[in-house]
C-alpha cells in the first residue's frame, strides 16, 4: 500500500529532459496578462526569447535529451524535414522558356525614354586644391550656380517696447539729477572749508572781501562769496581747487597705506571701511529699481531738509555708492 512501481531509466531521462526544457522555456512566457488592447512584449523579453531558442536548438542538435522529451514545447520531432525541391522535366523547362519568349515579344514597347545625361564637367584650374576649401570646383557645378552658398533668412526688425525706452530715459534723468546735487553738495562742502580757512587767517571783524574796494562796481560781500566780476572770484575758486587737491592727496595717502598694509592704522582703517561697506551692501536691495528709488528718495530728503540733515544724507549717499562699487 502506498508504494509506486519503480520508474525505468528511460522514463527518468524523459522527465529530466522535460524539466530542463521547462526551465529554458520559462523565460519565453511573458509575465502578466496579454490583451488585445496593445500590450506587447518588451525588447528584453524578445532578446531572452532569442537567446533561449538558440540554447534549445544547440541542445537539440547535440542530442541532450531523448526523443519525446520536448513534447511540452513542441519539439516532438527533433530532426526537421527538408523542404522538397521542385523537379523540372526537360519538357516543362522548354515550355517555360517558350512562354517567357512570347511574353517578351508581345509586351508593348516603352513610350517614354529618358535621354542619357552627360556627366558634369569639372573645371580644375592650375593651383586649385579641393582639399584646401577653394570654391573653384563648387562654382562650376550647376547646383551652386543658382543657390547662394549660405541661405539668408530675413527676419523683421524687432519693435522696441515703450516701457523699456521710458525706463531708460527715467533712469538717465535720475542719474543726472543725483550727479547734479552731489556736485552742488561737494561745492558747498568746499566753500565751508574755504570759509573755515579764511576765518583762521583773518580776524572775526574783518571778513569783508579785500577786492571790493579796488574800484569794481560790486556790492559789499564777504570773502569767499565773491560774485562774477570781482577780482577775488578767481582767487576763491583757486582756493577751492587747492582744498580739493589736498583732500585727494589725503585720500591717496590712505589708499597707499591701505594697499601696502605697513602700518597698524592702515590695517584698522581698511578693516573698518570693509566692515562698513559690507554691512551697507548687505542692507541694500538687489533690485536695480529699488536702488534707484532709494537714491531718489535720499535726494528728495536732501532738497527739503536743513543743512545738518543734508550733510548726513550726503554722507549716506556717498556710502551707498561706495557700497555699490564694493559689492560689484
Curated annotation (Swiss-Prot):
Subcellular location field: Virion membrane
- Per the record, a Pfam family? vMSA
Q: Name one GO cellular component term.
A: viral envelope
**Which positions, given as ranges, span the membrane?**
164-184, 237-257, 283-303
Record topological domains on the Virion surface side: 2-163, 258-282
Q: Which domain of life is it from?
A: Viruses
- Which residue stretches belong to region Pre-S? 2-161
Q: Which residues lie on this side of the membrane: Intravirion?
A: 2-236, 185-236, 304-328
According to UniProt, residues marked as the site described as Cleavage are 238-239
- Lipid group attachment sites (N-myristoyl glycine): 2
Residues of this chain annotated as glycosylated in UniProt = 260
Gene Ontology biological-process entries: membrane fusion involved in viral entry into host cell; symbiont entry into host cell; virion attachment to host cell
Where do the segments described as Disordered lie? 77-123
Biased composition regions of type Basic and acidic residues, renumbered to the chain: 92-109
Could you state what the record's PTM comment says about this protein?
A: Myristoylation contributes importantly to DHBV infectivity. It is most likely required for an early step of the life cycle involving the entry or uncoating of virus particles.
* Keywords assigned by UniProt, alphabetized: Fusion of virus membrane with host membrane, Glycoprotein, Host-virus interaction, Lipoprotein, Membrane, Myristate, Phosphoprotein, Transmembrane, Transmembrane helix, Viral attachment to host cell, Viral envelope protein, Viral penetration into host cytoplasm, Virion, Virus entry into host cell
Q: What does this protein do?
A: The large envelope protein exists in two topological conformations, one which is termed 'external' or Le-HBsAg and the other 'internal' or Li-HBsAg. In its external conformation the protein attaches the virus to cell receptors and thereby initiating infection. This interaction determines the species specificity and liver tropism. The large envelope protein probably also assumes fusion between virion and host membranes. In its internal conformation the protein plays a role in virion morphogenesis and mediates the contact with the nucleocapsid like a matrix protein.
Query: What is written about domains in the entry's comments?
Result: The large envelope protein is synthesized with the pre-S region at the cytosolic side of the endoplasmic reticulum and, hence will be within the virion after budding. Therefore the pre-S region is not N-glycosylated. Later a post-translational translocation of N-terminal pre-S and TM1 domains occur in about 50% of proteins at the virion surface. These molecules change their topology by an unknown mechanism, resulting in exposure of pre-S region at virion surface.
Subunit composition and interactions: Large internal envelope protein interacts with capsid protein.
Family label: Belongs to the avihepadnavirus major surface antigen family.
**Listed name of the protein:** Large envelope protein
Task: Give the organism the record lists.
Answer: Duck hepatitis B virus (strain Germany/DHBV-3) (DHBV)
Lineage of origin: Viruses, Riboviria, Pararnavirae, Artverviricota, Revtraviricetes
Q: Which gene encodes it?
A: S
